[in-house]
Amino acid sequence: MEINHLEKINSKVVSYGAKLLPVVKNRTNDEIKFLYDFGFREFAENRLEDFKQHKEVYGDVNYHFIAPIQSRKLSEISQNFTYIHTISRVKEVDILGSLERNCHYLIQVNIDND
């Protein structure tokens, strides 16, 4: 992505009081560095393994987890991510309630019974 294009998009989004959240899954190190150098300090990731590689390079970034969660990985995810966007089951809420973590959670609620 060209920097001018990104600047225009980001400026428009910010003018509405929102912010862009780059999803870095399947991105190369050069692409992530471009976003980091642009000034982004929050990235979204959907794989714990990929996050670990990114965290080594970009340790001052807040990370958002954006994939369905496996209960057995929930503790590790909550330790490493600032936000979890994909809480969708009561079991996950119960597990998170038993953990003492400083993580923000976004809960998906299905109101259509799908």
What are these regions (language model features)?
Residues M1-D114:
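Conserved alpha/beta-domain cores
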